Swiss-Prot record:
Residues 566-573 are annotated as: Leucine-zipper. Residues 543-562 are annotated as: Basic motif. Its main location: nucleus. Gene3D superfamilies: Transcription factor, Skn-1-like, DNA-binding domain (1.10.880.10). This is Nuclear factor erythroid 2-related factor 3. It is found in: Nucleus. High level expression in brain, thymus, testis and placenta. Medium level expression in uterus, stomach and lung. Low level expression in kidney. No expression in heart, liver, spleen and ovary. It comes from the Eukaryota. Keywords: Activator, DNA-binding, Nucleus, Transcription, Transcription regulation. GO terms for cellular component: RNA polymerase II transcription regulator complex. Activates erythroid-specific, globin gene expression. Residues 120-214 are annotated as: Disordered. GO terms for molecular function: DNA-binding transcription repressor activity, RNA polymerase II-specific; RNA polymerase II cis-regulatory region sequence-specific DNA binding.
Length: 660
């Protein structure tokens, strides 16, 4: 089992001081107090079931609180938290919450249980503080201790010896209640269908319960011994309910002078009481370490021991000032994680005080009302520090969001040509200006930008002093805002986008649109003019609009026909060029084929003349003779002289016939 750390180790006292400062209670922490004595550390170590041999006092004899390396950073965090100022929390709301925090049926039992637990815890704490060498001036320097001594002076002191019996009764009741809580949590897990995990958790719970019972018995023996030996702190014992009532009855700034030196006896006793009596409570299912103020104010009894991890991660991303920046408690550093005392204290108080609360009470208690209900004037009155140039406008109306968005639209690349775009829109026959490239933002991006601005405006009152890099709005941003306002006004005004004919028709209250006047057939147009009682000016304007519209349509049709003819002519030219190329290719192929035929014919002539012989058996000379083909298919060998003379005689005859 893991060795439980004392509540003051690891900066637990400093974290408690920071938590009280966030609530509004100012506590002066002296970081140069002497460290706890070794005797007190030796008395606290037997509370652990298994004490390792290496366990020792975390504070050396020569070094004090100032020697701890983690305290300077947390000291700076405490000063930053105090610099935020005291938040305004209505006291009437807190008092009503405390009055109605316990149901009527279980009020006596719950208050009695808390009273006995606090009384026994205070008694134990006083004895441990005296045994450990605590500061004796803590009992007299605190105004709370003085008031408690005055109240306890009138009460009998015979109740002190019964502190051990009350502690044993408290341990029994806490065991029964923790067993009931564990049983209910096991039933919920069985309903969810995780049977394997439920069995493993049940086994671990039984082992922890056995170990917790053994440690509780040892704690009871220690508390009985301390009650018998040390009784001087019993006069200052008081219950948690009395403490809460006392804190609520004090003025707003009356508790700022209380130092931490007055608190250690009571807090140490409460720590020991909780460690001794609530060991069997399953701390793995308790409130996780990443606790913020929003979750603490909106804590319901149903989800005290269980929290949805998705909801926890979503809430951790909200711009609240959280105590722990890590969303996963396993990955949190030991320096920033809250000690086990803080978890057990919240577990005990939430289990006893918030278990029987009606859920309707928590519906009216919402931390968001502190941000949404304030006006800028009230916020400026509550916080005395300047706002460092940032706007405290926390309203949710669209005007503020639009104005805040206009300040930043110059940084995303908007062009001032949108203003000229509105004025350059022509009438029916007008032309549109040259298109420009404008920056376009998606609607989802703009919506997300609005949401982020809205969150910063609402929740920045506690964190605006940390934003040192945020510069004040310059004159350039205001110039961009003016340009964007003109552009948005130009786009939002419907009269600017109308044509000249539409504006004239609207001015004369003509009951027809320009499109109907232009596109309507002639018969319908004439019947329309006869049905309505129109003035001469309206009729002339309607006819002018129709004439200009028809001329515009005719011109558009003419341009369309010209474009069609040009496009068709271009297509025809392309087709003719393709056909010409095809014919050229075909001619080339034909000339190649003719050349091949001539070569073959010449080879055939050579072959024939090589085979021919005259009457004397000599070969025929192809240069003197030629082959002549007749119509019947016969082939004759004729001298070339006769063929050439016959061609010459036929040529003059042909010329004569042409002349005749």
């Amino acid at each position: 089992m893991k060795l439980p750390k004392p509540w003051w180790a690891g900066g637990g006292l400093l974290q408690l001081t920071i938590l009280l400062s966030l609530v509004g209670l100012r506590v002066d922490l002296d970081l140069f107090l002497p460290p706890p004595a070794a005797a007190l550390w030796e008395e606290l170590l037997p509370l652990c079931p298994t004490r390792p041999a290496s366990a020792s006092n975390p504070f050396s004899a020569s070094e004090g609180w100032e020697r701890t390396p983690l305290l300077p950073a947390k000291g700076r965090l405490l000063h930053e938290v105090r610099a935020l100022g005291v938040p305004f929390i209505p006291r009437t709301r807190v008092d009503a919450w405390l009055v109605h925090s316990v149901a009527t049926g279980n009020a006596d039992g719950a208050h009695g249980l808390l009273g006995t637990a606090a009384s026994s815890a205070v008694g134990d704490g006083g004895q441990s503080a005296s045994a450990g060498g605590g500061d004796p001036r803590a009992a007299h320097s605190s105004p709370l201790a003085a008031e408690e001594e005055e109240e306890k002076a009138a009460e009998p002191t015979a109740q002190v010896p019964d502190a051990g019996g009350c502690g044993s009764q408290e341990n029994g009741m806490l065991r029964e209640k923790s067993e009931a809580v564990d049983h209910s949590s096991q039933q919920e897990e069985n309903e969810e269908g995780v049977s394997a995990q439920a069995k493993s958790r049940q086994q671990s719970k039984t082992e922890e319960h056995k170990m917790a019972c053994a440690s509780a018995r040892e704690a009871e023996k220690i508390t009985e011994a301390r009650n018998e030996s040390h009784l001087h702190w019993s006069d200052t014992s008081f219950s948690l309910e009395d403490l809460f009532q006392l804190l609520s009855s004090q003025p707003e700034h009356s508790l700022e002078g209380i130092s931490v030196e007055d608190i250690p006896p009571f807090l140490s006793s409460v720590c020991e009481s909780v460690n001794s009596s609530a060991q069997n409570i399953n701390l793995s299912q308790a409130i996780s370490h990443d606790v913020n103020l929003h979750e603490a104010m909106l804590l319901y009894p149903n989800n005290t021991f269980r929290r949805d991890p998705s909801a926890r991660s979503s809430q951790a991303q909200e711009p609240f000032l959280q105590l722990n920046p890590h969303t996963n408690p396993e990955q949190a550093t030991p320096a920033m994680s809250l000690p086990p005392f803080d978890n057990q204290m919240r577990n005990l108080t939430s289990q006893d005080l918030l278990y029987d609360l009606d859920s309707n009470i928590f519906d009216g208690i919402n931390l968001m009302s502190l941000a949404t209900g304030f006006s800028p004037l009230e916020v400026s009155q509550l916080f005395e520090e300047p706002d460092s140039g940032l706007s405290l406008n926390s309203s949710y109306n669209s005007t503020s969001l639009t104005n805040s968005y206009r300040i930043y639209d110059g940084t995303v690349g908007y062009n001032s040509d949108l203003q000229s775009l509105c004025h350059d829109l022509g009438a029916v026959g007008g032309c549109y200006p040259e298109p420009h490239k404008h920056c376009h933002m998606d609607h989802r991006t703009i919506a997300g930008f609005h949401v982020s601005l809205e969150c910063q405006q609402v929740f920045h009152d506690h964190t605006y002093h940390l934003q040192s890099g945020a510069s004040e709005p310059t004159s350039e941003s205001f110039a961009w805002s003016e340009k964007s306002q003109k552009t948005s006004g130009c786009l939002d005004n419907p009269d600017r986008n109308l044509s000249r004919d539409e504006q004239r028709a609207k001015a004369l209250h003509i009951p027809f649109s320009v499109d109907e006047i232009v596109r309507m057939p002639v018969d319908s147009f004439n019947s329309m003019l006869s049905r309505y009682y129109l003035t001469d000016l309206q009729v002339s304007l309607i006819r002018d609009i129709r004439r200009r519209g028809k001329n515009k349509v005719a011109a558009q049709n003419c341009r369309k026909r010209k474009l069609d003819i040009i496009l068709n002519l271009e297509d025809d030219i392309c087709n003719l060029q393709a056909k010409k190329e095809a014919l050229k290719n075909e001619q080339t192929q034909c000339s190649k084929a003719i050349d091949i035929m001539r070569q073959k014919l010449h080879g055939l002539h050579q072959d024939v003349f090589n085979r021919l012989r005259d009457d004397q058996g000599r070969p025929v000379n192809p240069s003197q003779y030629a082959l002549q083909y007749s119509h019947d298919g016969t082939v004759l060998i004729v001298p070339k002289e006769l063929i050439s003379s016959g061609h010459k005689k036929e040529a003059p005859k042909g010329k004569r016939e042409r002349r005749n």
